[in-house]
Amino acid sequence: MVSIYVPLIYITILMGSMYGVSRFVRKSKNQESKPVSEEWFGENYSRNIFFSLLQQNPPAEDTLLKAALVLRATEGLRRLMKLKVSRMALNNLLNRGGVGDELIRKFGRLEKETELELMDIAKTANSLQPGWNQFIFQTCNEIIENEKIHSIIDNIPKDIDSISQRWQTEKILYEAADEELRIQAQKELGVL
């Protein structure tokens, strides 16, 4: 009687473990099909806006499509710049053994996705206006630089307040030290 239960328990455990492994494999495959750029950077709203404008019925105006494409290209360039900075840090971590192969593979996929995105932007720009693919990235780079300058300018008033306070404290300390030196010099001369 005991001998009949042992094979049944064995088969049940075997089938359960096979089911668990197959479920794990299917789940991991579903996660890999998701674009890596969404995991890394979040959703690309400018790309979504551009594609929604393309699919509008009646079609959107060319100027609106071009503006949306410039926004999409600007976001693509921002992501590319972040990837370049991250690549250097990732290489340092890789040399030290601080990251695994999975992260390296994901980062490689992310770089390829970004390159494909930029190539698609260039093709789309050329289809909207022939020859525009050569100038769109220059325009986007200027937009990014302009945003950097504006962020620096926006931080200037905050810096002015802190610099002004520091200057006032240093001025008081300097005047006190100067007064002390003046008194000491007068004592040495015998004036006091």
UniProtKB/Swiss-Prot annotation:
The chain crosses the membrane at residues 4-21. It is a single-pass type II membrane protein. Residues 1-3 are lumenal. Pfam families: Sec66. Residues 22-192 are cytoplasmic. It is found in: Endoplasmic reticulum membrane. One of its GO terms (cellular component) is Sec62/Sec63 complex. The modification Phosphoserine is found at S162. It comes from the Eukaryota. Keywords: Endoplasmic reticulum, Membrane, Phosphoprotein, Protein transport, Signal-anchor, Transmembrane, Transmembrane helix, Transport. GO terms for biological process: post-translational protein targeting to membrane, translocation. PANTHER family: TRANSLOCATION PROTEIN SEC66. Acts as a component of the Sec62/63 complex which is involved in SRP-independent post-translational translocation across the endoplasmic reticulum (ER) and functions together with the Sec61 complex and bip1 in a channel-forming translocon complex. A cycle of assembly and disassembly of Sec62/63 complex from sec61 may govern the activity of the translocon. sec66 is required to attach or retain sec72 in the sec63 complex. Component of the heterotetrameric Sec62/63complex composed of sec62, sec63, sec66 and sec72. The Sec62/63 complex associates with the Sec61 complex to form the Sec complex. This is Translocation protein sec66. It comes from Schizosaccharomyces pombe (strain 972 / ATCC 24843). The gene is sec66.
